Design a protein with these regions (language model features):
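An acidic- and aromatic-residue-enriched active-site/binding cleft used to recognize and process polar
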Residues: 55, 72, 107-110
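Short amphipathic alpha-helix that is part of the acyltransferase structural core
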Residues: 1-48, 68, 135-152
């Protein structure tokens, strides 16, 4: 997300869709290399996006590289054109064969869509740390919404 114009457009669409953006996150030194947006744009405006966010998890005492599919959004005027499906297929093809975990937190209305792509529901756990435990260097925890559902 080093392209300032693209970052501005991605943040604008994220604000319209979810009511937040990533600018503070970027300005506070969190690494953009781990956040990879896949987008369709028209006339310089992002109209659909799915992002890959790389992170490490501790699974049974072993560190495992995983990626989260997030910031899944589509401009209302572009819905029902298959843009998100195309982006998801492109991402899954791109990382096919890489030994990693893939997960997302899908909204309940999109579960059938994700199932068609091969995702399945799994048990979800939530862990928290007291403020000040995490330093800016190294790997970071990401917030998890309580009503989210993990798939694939």
């Amino acid at each position: 997300m080093h392209n300032t114009v693209f970052r501005y457009e991605l943040n604008a669409m994220t604000r319209r869709t979810f009511g937040f953006d990533f600018e503070n996150w970027m300005q506070n030194g969190f690494r953009a290399e781990e956040y990879i947006p896949y987008s369709f744009e028209e006339k310089g405006r992002i109209v659909a996006n799915v992002s890959v966010n790389w992170m490490f998890f501790n699974k049974n005492g072993e560190e495992q590289l995983c990626f989260q599919l997030g910031t899944v959004m589509e401009d209302k005027a572009y819905r029902s054109r298959g843009l998100i499906w195309q982006l998801m297929e492109r991402i899954l093809e791109r990382y096919d064969g890489i030994e990693t975990g893939i997960y997302l937190f899908g909204n309940l209305g999109a579960l059938d869509f994700y199932r068609k792509l091969g995702f399945r529901e799994l048990m979800q756990y939530e862990y928290t740390l007291k403020p000040g435990v995490i330093k800016r260097e190294g790997r970071h925890f990401r917030p998890v919404k309580k009503d989210a559902l993990a798939l694939r």
